[in-house]
């Protein structure tokens, strides 16, 4: 299983853009893999940008209804909310690295979700921000995602605890 992978807006848009015959199938291949492994991650910012661009700028664009279906499906990718933690982390990144505010928000969202990889075309391919690697999905083949981006599948927590005393409570012995 690959570690969580943050997907920037442009990758989602390329997957819908029939006017990009080279990039569209590559973006689709990445998204298919991330859906299969349940390792895709995004942010509220990405969802907003996707909705606006796929309905207003992409030619031919999607209807608002179809675009919203995509957004709702992507809720399962655990969108990072725009909250105080995200803004604070983005500001730290903006001060430390030569990043725009919007790129700082993307990197911060990926870091807060503990992603190993950020797929984007907007940042330098191969850039490193702490433990986060930036790669272009058009230079890194899905099949080349090896050891640096792999994690052991976490064991699922039990759905319910056994009935009885709350976890961690024990009767005191005298």
For the regions a language model picked out, list residue spans one by one.
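Active-site-proximal, substrate-binding regions of enzyme catalytic domains
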Residues: 28, 45, 51-78, 85
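Short beta-strand segments at enzyme active-site cores
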Residues: 42-44, 119-120
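Active-site neighborhoods of divalent-metal-dependent phosphate/nucleic-acid chemistry enzymes
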Residues: 79-121, 158-160, 168
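Acidic active-site catalytic centers that drive phospho-/nucleotidyl reactions
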Residues: 8-10, 49, 103, 122
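General small-molecule cofactor/ligand-binding pocket signal
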Residues: 41, 80-81, 135
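Short, well-structured N-terminal submotif of metal-dependent ribonuclease cores
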Residues: 1-42, 57-65, 144-147, 152-174
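Alpha-helix C-capping/helix-to-loop hinge sites
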Residues: 15, 33-37, 53-57, 74-78, ...
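Acidic, metal-binding active-site segment of PIN/NYN-like and related structure-specific nucleases
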Residues: 104-146
């Amino acid at each position: 299983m690959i570690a969580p992978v943050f997907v920037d807006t442009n990758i989602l848009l390329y997957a819908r853009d029939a006017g990009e015959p080279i990039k569209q199938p590559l973006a689709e291949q990445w998204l298919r893999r991330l859906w299969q492994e349940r390792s895709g991650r995004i942010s509220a910012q990405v969802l907003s940008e996707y909705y606006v661009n796929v309905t207003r700028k992409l030619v031919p664009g999607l209807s608002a209804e179809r675009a919203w279906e995509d957004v709702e499906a992507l809720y399962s990718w655990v969108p990072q909310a725009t909250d105080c933690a995200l803004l604070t982390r983005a500001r730290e990144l903006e001060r430390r690295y030569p990043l725009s505010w919007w790129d700082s928000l993307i990197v911060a969202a990926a870091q807060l979700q503990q992603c190993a990889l950020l797929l984007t075309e907007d940042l330098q391919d191969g850039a490193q921000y702490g433990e986060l690697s930036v790669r272009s999905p058009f230079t890194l083949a899905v099949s080349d995602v090896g050891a640096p981006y792999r994690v052991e599948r976490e064991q699922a927590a039990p759905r319910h605890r056994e009935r009885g005393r709350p976890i961690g409570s024990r009767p005191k012995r005298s």
